[in-house]
């Protein structure tokens, strides 16, 4: 791979009055990109007049399900209205019931942990591997109890988790593995697509995702016909609705109404045909950026084990205090200062999650269904303490992310300018380290805002 050399520029930081590394006219390209093919797919549905259907055989939705199952390599796929619904339906289809425990990594999007709550199951958190940012298999076994029913394995930012070790532990204890591949479309683990390894698996089609629809959407994959049938029932009122024939309106299960619509399905089908080419270009663009960043020892770029591929949904960059002449305990202040410097240069360096999931108030305050599921008979009400997850805390403190800017195939020139910005920041490391050493700093999770119940009133009108 050819590494593009940085453009000639002043070494004065923008935060000190210098020129930006990233020209303002070189903005982030809209995502998802919408091609003429995508527009034609949507127009096809509009002309048909079939926007949704009670039938499980609706053409666009069923077509998306077939095509995604083929892409991932599973026997079955069930489409739903969003990624969080996909996870709730998948857990329900896997047999998770009230009072069961579901293991979730301490670092993920909130939906990974609230999905079990909607089934009255108890989320149990496990720390992450600080290199892959995924659930740490070494910490997994200690979290398993006789009540553990499932493990939600998140492929965070697009990198597959260590599935061999996780599935071996799960099989030994008779626990169901559910892949949360919301950020990992197209990523592979030892030659297999993510979403084909667990017993039942989920994807998100939110507009921010690598495979995006025009709004929200979710996909569930499995090789188990019974699980797929149960997912279909949970998707639509608990009914077993035939592809053809009359609807009986008999609810066999307590289900939801989370079926997608045909317009979003058609748009996603079109986007899917373009996904492999976009993945290849993204790999090239991101590889060039990370290749340049790797030359600066103060920035730790994502590591990809040789047995897997990365979808590059989010780029998480850690900082190394020692390379700036600082002690480890100054990682947080250093990250904060570097983040500000990069943003001044035009790089959208932002956090992803401000606190570990177990620090979220919905868990610490037991804000489920009137204190349930924690108050169910026989449930062990474990404390949720951020300090129990040191790797997660460290990663949140010493890293920032780049999101969305790199997804568009034409983002290469923009990412080259981002690399210029990182170089300029590195060249000014002594000045930035001096600022970090005297910065008054409090970690995100200690200052995350908490809205008192009395402050909720009027929040809608204040938007």
Predicted regions and their residues:
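N-terminal "arm"/small-domain region of PLP-dependent enzymes with the aminotransferase-like
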Residues: 1-53, 402-404, 458, 463
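PLP-dependent enzyme catalytic core of the Aspartate aminotransferase-like
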Residues: 2-3, 364-463
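Active-site region of PLP-dependent enzymes
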Residues: 184-190, 197-317
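Phosphate-binding glycine-rich loop
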Residues: 50-101, 115-119, 125-127, 192
